[in-house]
Swiss-Prot record:
It is found in: Nucleus. One of its GO terms (biological process) is inner ear morphogenesis. Residues 12-68 are annotated as: PAI subdomain. This is Paired box protein Pax-8. One of its GO terms (cellular component) is nucleoplasm. Residues 159-224 are annotated as: Disordered. Interacts with WWTR1. SUPFAM superfamilies: Homeodomain-like. Residues 9-135 bind DNA.
């Protein structure tokens, strides 16, 4: 390799075994060989291995070649030679005017083909785009004499001098007043003819100054005068915001007083009293609609103290109580007298009738004043179950709970069922004689173990 024979200066071997000289660029022959292999379609990694040049060096050389078309090394720390010479810029402008849709890389190839530039001095694609953007397509507000491409405009395009431009007509020059002016939008009276003429003159002067400033780069640059709002204009603009958009939400004080007069406080109190009267009366039963439902009147004074006393059950009570309970109790609620006659007070009443047994776990229930205490039975029992069956689960109570007459052998007397036989209702007649079927008749003898276990379920 030619670059391996370089021995001048500080050199060495790279990671691929190729010789290099520190601080010196790669030889011209190696650079050209890299470009040739790239044109042949060899990958940069293969070029790096074949020429024993680092991959970064190959990529940098190829990238610079694709960008500028030159394989010469750049000057480190120095400035590049100017490639956008006036001759090159003029040629680029000519190409672009002849074919406005021409791409930058086509312009670059044409510059090389016509010999305007060589591979070292040809501008890059990005440079050509920058030249087209900044020098060929001049902005409209640049001076006429400083434009490079002024002399070579297309025949169909002409530039109009600024002196021939008619200033825009002021919206207030109309004698009747423009609807789109500030005064027209705000509904303010138009000023006099003299004032309008002065305003028109000042607007036209400001427009002319702004346009003339574009044709002279030395003069001071003045912008169009912005419309300033007077105090009268500001007050007219603030008026819509001072009005209430929602009068119902923010009513005036007089409106509020009128509303209060329509609904005085005594009228509201009487309406509340009428509403209370329409509520459920004391005689209306609460809870479930039971056949043997009993109600009690509400105590007149809910704050009166109550005394809870225990009474022993009557001797004639036939209720069966479990043997585990030592004694049963009945609750009587009696209003404590306040010193008045006995007839004036509410007569004592029983919360539960004497026929119902009350266990110890029910003696601690809270008493709710103002509500009715209903039902002759304990909670959880249907109304048709006699009270004697609510005390325990003895066999006699279970026999009383299910009446055997309801399941007798007689046919139904009801018309829809009179045509059906006994076999239709009870296809298996052995169910009626089963020891587990409860009837009013005596139960047939069954094994004591099974009967006892069933009774205690």
């Amino acid at each position: 390799m030619p670059h391996n024979s370089i021995r001048s200066g500080h050199g060495g071997l790279n990671q691929l075994g190729g010789a290099f000289v520190n601080g010196r660029p790669l030889p011209e022959v190696v650079r050209q060989r890299i470009v040739d292999l790239a044109h042949q379609g060899v990958r940069p990694c293969d070029i790096s291995r074949q020429l024993r040049v680092s991959h970064g060096c190959v990529s940098k050389i190829l990238g610079r070649y694709y960008e500028t078309g030159s394989i010469r090394p750049g000057v480190i720390g120095g400035s590049k030679p100017k490639v956008a010479t006036p001759k090159v810029v003029e040629k680029i402008g000519d190409y672009k005017r002849q074919n406005p849709t021409m791409f930058a890389w086509e312009i670059r190839d044409r510059l090389l083909a016509e010999g305007v530039c060589d591979n070292d001095t040809v501008p890059s694609v990005s440079s050509i785009n920058r030249i087209i953007r900044t020098k060929v397509q001049q902005p409209f507000n640049l001076p006429m004499d400083s434009c490079v491409a002024t002399k070579s405009l297309s025949p169909g395009h002409t530039l109009i001098p600024s002196s021939a431009v008619t200033p825009p007509e002021s919206p207030q020059s109309d004698s009747l007043g423009s609807t789109y002016s500030i005064n027209g939008l705000l509904g303010i009276a138009q000023p006099g003819n003299d004032n309008k003429r002065k305003m028109d003159d000042s607007d036209q002067d400001s427009c002319r100054l702004s346009i003339d400033s574009q044709s002279s780069s030395s003069g001071p640059r003045k912008h169009l005068r912005t419309d300033t709002f007077s105090q009268h204009h500001l007050e007219a603009l603030e008026c819509p915001f001072e009005r209430q958009h929602y009068p119902e939400a923010y009513a005036s004080p007089s409106h509020t007083k009128g509303e209060q007069g329509l609904y005085p406080l005594p009228l509201l109190n009487s309406a509340l009293d009428d509403g209370k009267a329409t509520l459920t009366s004391s005689n209306t039963p609460l809870g479930r609609n039971l056949s043997t439902h009993q109600t009690y009147p509400v105590v007149a004074d809910p704050h009166s103290p109550f005394a809870i006393k225990q009474e022993t059950p009557e001797l004639s009570s036939s209720s069966s109580t479990p043997s585990s309970l030592s004694s049963s109790a009945f609750l009587d609620l009696q209003q404590v007298g306040s010193g008045g006659p006995a007839g004036a007070s509410v007569p004592p009443f029983n919360a539960f009738p004497h026929a119902a047994s009350v266990y110890g776990q029910f003696t601690g229930q809270a008493l709710l004043s103002g509500r009715e205490m209903v039902g002759p039975t304990l909670p959880g029992y249907p109304p048709h179950i006699p009270t004697s069956g609510q005390g325990s689960y003895a066999s006699s109570a279970i026999a009383g709970m299910v009446a055997g007459s309801e399941y007798s052998g007689n046919a139904y007397s009801h018309t829809p069922y009179s045509s059906y036989s006994e076999a239709w209702r009870f296809p298996n007649s052995s169910l009626l004689s089963s020891p587990y079927y409860y009837s009013s008749t005596s139960r047939p003898s069954a094994p004591p173990t099974s009967a006892t276990a069933f009774d205690h379920l």
